[in-house]
A protein has these predicted regions:
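Substrate-binding/catalytic groove segments of enzymes
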Residues: 318-327, 337-340
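Intrinsically disordered, low-complexity segments enriched in small/polar residues
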Residues: 55, 78-82, 102, 187, ...
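Acidic surface patches and DE-rich sequence motifs
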Residues: 69, 201, 321
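Glycine-centered flexibility motif
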Residues: 44-51, 56-60, 122, 179-181, ...
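Outer-membrane beta-barrel transmembrane strands
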Residues: 1-39, 95-166, 230-263, 267-269, ...
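N-terminal, post-signal peptide beta-strand-biased segments of exported outer-membrane/organellar beta-barrel
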Residues: 1-83
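Extracellular/periplasm-exposed beta-strand and loop segments of Gram-negative cell-envelope proteins
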Residues: 35-40, 85-118, 158-245, 274-307, ...
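Surface-exposed charge patches in extracellular/virion surface proteins
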Residues: 67, 224, 363-365
């Protein structure tokens, strides 16, 4: 009809000089194995065993003594301090002769966890140029087939993450301080401590008086032991590899019109990939008996990688006008690469592959 000839003139779609597509693509995945997990160094300073110093622990602190005379003059060192604190009653030795303080850290037992980043949507642009046509001309003087070259650019995100609990060796540094015969306090306890008492004078007058009832503790350990218990630390963790890869491609294409409104387009070429990824982790050992959680967390800087692969696609195109249409495409990018990221003594083995994917979007000819 006349309306049909206006919509689909004899200058057929396939004889346009070039084209442009904008689409959403779903492509690629990454499998990640995180290795050597679970080493957490203590953030507390327990110092050396000998000598007067402030020593901090996961269940208390022993500070330098700050006792003074009534005139504010420091008392001579008598080997004790009234500035210390404890968190748990279990720190009192069975014979009640002293208090045990602990500084914990963990050592990796080689724990591993796996994470996967499945196919995620990204954006894709392609610019094409027609080089020629093929096939016997039809009654309207058009050729059913055409071919040319293309340049394409795609963007895809990677986000492989997981949470879980791993086991590691628990290292305990135990320092024992003498009470020198004093009665152990009830935990939690902080010295110096005071007590308010009522004093009755000779005339029967009651007066409230604040007295120092601090319990003195030795100002340095009488013993120190270090023990390692394999698998005793249950560590909760979060591990992630995150990034983006940009793929550029070039090659040749061929289009064949089944009808005025329906065509099939195939393309093949090479693809170039630039990948930027970073690794992060957060591992922690928490317990109600610890004043400070044992924790290690870090995020690494973005690391760049380059790779080359193959590209192929098969498109089904539905033309809405002589120059504009919709398309759906099955794609393949033959990219396969193994990467290794290291951070804080931990390693992430990344197996990156593109494989089969899908695109859909808008195409226009000019």
């Amino acid at each position: 009809s006349q309306g049909s000839s206006n919509l689909w003139p004899s200058e057929v779609i396939g004889e346009s000089s070039g084209g442009f597509t904008f689409s959403v693509r779903v492509l690629g995945n990454a499998n990640v194995t995180f290795r050597d997990l679970g080493t957490i160094e203590s953030s507390l300073d327990s110092g050396e065993r000998f000598g007067e110093a402030t020593r901090t622990y996961h269940d208390g602190v022993v500070q330098l003594d700050q006792r003074t005379t009534a005139d504010g003059v420091d008392l001579p060192d008598d080997g004790y301090t009234s500035y210390w604190s404890m968190l748990n009653d279990s720190q009192v030795l069975p014979d009640q002769s002293g208090i045990a303080f602990h500084n914990y850290s963990t050592i990796s037992d080689g724990a591993t966890v796996d994470a996967e980043s499945g196919s995620k949507p990204g954006f894709d642009l392609e610019l094409s140029r027609r080089f020629g046509g093929f096939g016997k001309r039809m009654s309207d003087n058009r050729r059913p087939g055409s071919w040319g070259g293309f340049l394409g650019l795609g963007l895809t995100d990677i986000n492989a993450k997981t949470t879980g609990t791993i086991n590691a060796t628990l290292r305990s540094i135990t320092d024992v301080y003498s009470l020198d015969g004093a009665t152990p306090p009830t935990a939690p306890y902080t010295a110096p401590s005071t007590e308010t008492v009522t004093v009755i004078g000779p005339d029967g007058t009651e007066t409230s008086v604040v007295i120092n009832n601090s319990i003195l503790l030795a100002n340095q350990p009488i013993s120190r032991t270090v023990t390692d218990e394999a698998g005793a630390a249950a560590i909760d963790g979060f591990w992630q590899v995150k990034g983006t890869y940009v793929s550029a491609r070039t090659g040749v294409w061929s289009r064949f019109h089944i009808s005025r409104q329906l065509s099939i387009r195939a393309s093949a070429g090479v693809s170039f990939h630039l990948l930027g990824v970073d690794m992060r982790y957060d591992e922690r050992l928490e317990d109600e008996t610890l004043a400070v959680p044992i924790r290690a967390q870090e995020q690494g800087e973005t690391t760049s990688y380059e790779a080359v692969g193959l590209f192929g696609s098969l498109d089904v195109e539905l033309w809405l006008t002589r120059r504009t249409g919709l398309f759906a495409s099955f794609t393949y990018e033959g990219l396969s690469d193994d990467l290794a990221l290291t951070l804080g003594g931990r390693t992430a083995d990344v197996e990156l592959s593109s494989g089969a994917g899908f695109r859909f979007g808008l195409t226009t000819l000019f």
